């Protein structure tokens, strides 16, 4: 692919990510994506085969960030509880830098488009399984309380992250947080929970 072609495809992806995140699949048209990207609408079909394929590619790109993070955390020679702390710190950073990720992925669960639900669920399952495995490992290591249920811990961590980003503006106003302090707030919330299950 030439530099020009790559640039056009990237512009389409960037525009589509922004529009799908701020609106949704049905409310976003090829014309909207073409206008925002500055790329001829015919090229959207050329590169991605239409709006549905483009939507799935956008979702895939967003989920890859989290799957790559899981791989990197798993490579670290740390205790399970420290891996959980590292994961929550890094995922908070990713989502503060790229807040559209949460809106895209979780909107598909809340208001399914009908053709990507299984795709998104499979990615979320991998994240859940990763957290479940770490908690189970932590119990075996003796660094996490044996009384906790791994799947409940995984759901709680996921819920803290998702709730914060889906209600971000309300939380910011209620807690009088500035944008600069939001990442610190989320890290502290997650760390407080992890501290409560650690031995």
Feature roles, as predicted:
Residues 8-17, 33, 58-66, 131:
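Generic hydrophobic, amphipathic alpha-helix propensity
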Residues 1-7:
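N-terminal intrinsically disordered/low-complexity leader segments
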Residues 86, 90-93, 97, 125-141, ...:
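C-terminal peripheral helix-coil segments that are non-catalytic and often amphipathic
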Residues 82, 118-123, 140-156:
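All-alpha amphipathic helical-bundle segments outside canonical DNA-binding/catalytic cores
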Residues 55, 59, 63, 117-128, ...:
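Amphipathic, non-transmembrane alpha-helical scaffold segments
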Residues 96-118, 167-173:
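Amphipathic alpha-helical segments used for helix-helix packing
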Residues 3, 58-86:
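Amphipathic alpha-helical linker/stalk segments
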Residues 11, 19-53, 57:
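Helix-turn-helix
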């Amino acid at each position: 692919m030439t530099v020009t072609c790559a640039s056009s495809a990237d512009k389409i992806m960037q525009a589509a990510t922004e529009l799908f995140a701020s609106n949704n699949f049905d409310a976003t048209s090829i014309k909207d994506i073409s206008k925002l990207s500055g790329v001829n609408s015919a090229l959207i079909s050329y590169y991605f085969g239409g709006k549905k394929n483009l939507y799935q590619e956008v979702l895939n790109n967003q989920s890859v960030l989290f799957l790559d993070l899981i791989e990197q955390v798993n490579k670290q020679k740390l205790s399970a509880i420290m891996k959980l702390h590292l994961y929550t710190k890094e995922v908070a950073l990713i989502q503060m830098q790229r807040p559209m990720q949460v809106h895209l992925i979780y909107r598909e669960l809340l208001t399914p488009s009908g053709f990507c639900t299984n795709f998104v669920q499979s990615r979320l399952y991998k994240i859940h399984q990763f957290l479940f495995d770490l908690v189970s490992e932590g119990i075996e290591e003796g660094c996490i309380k044996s009384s906790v249920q791994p799947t409940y811990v995984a759901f709680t961590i996921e819920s803290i992250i998702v709730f914060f980003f889906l209600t971000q503006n309300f939380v910011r106003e209620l807690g009088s947080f500035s944008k600069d302090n939001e990442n610190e707030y989320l890290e502290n919330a997650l760390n407080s929970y992890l501290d409560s299950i650690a031995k």
